[in-house]
């Protein structure tokens, strides 16, 4: 078992990140390059390998 995802992200680093709204864990979507907060209904983009954890950059994933 490896500690990196298919894109080379450190799993431990991704596990340490939490939703800035709910403080819930995030799910990594490799295809969309986003960190998903199911609890808040938001998707935070990853650009150039850097998670953008700003609310004004997040995409709403449910109404």
From Swiss-Prot:
Family affiliation: Belongs to the UPF0434 family.
Name of the protein described by the UniProt record: UPF0434 protein Pden_2369
Any one GO cellular component localisation term in the record: cytosol
Pfam families with a match to the protein in the record: Trm112p
């Amino acid at each position: 078992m490896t500690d990196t995802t298919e894109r080379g992200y450190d799993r431990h680093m991704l596990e340490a990140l939490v939703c800035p709204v709910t403080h819930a864990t995030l799910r990594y979507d490799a295809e969309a390059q986003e960190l998903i907060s199911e609890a808040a209904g938001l998707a935070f983009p990853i650009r150039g390998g850097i998670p953008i954890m700003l609310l004004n950059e997040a995409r709403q994933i449910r109404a």
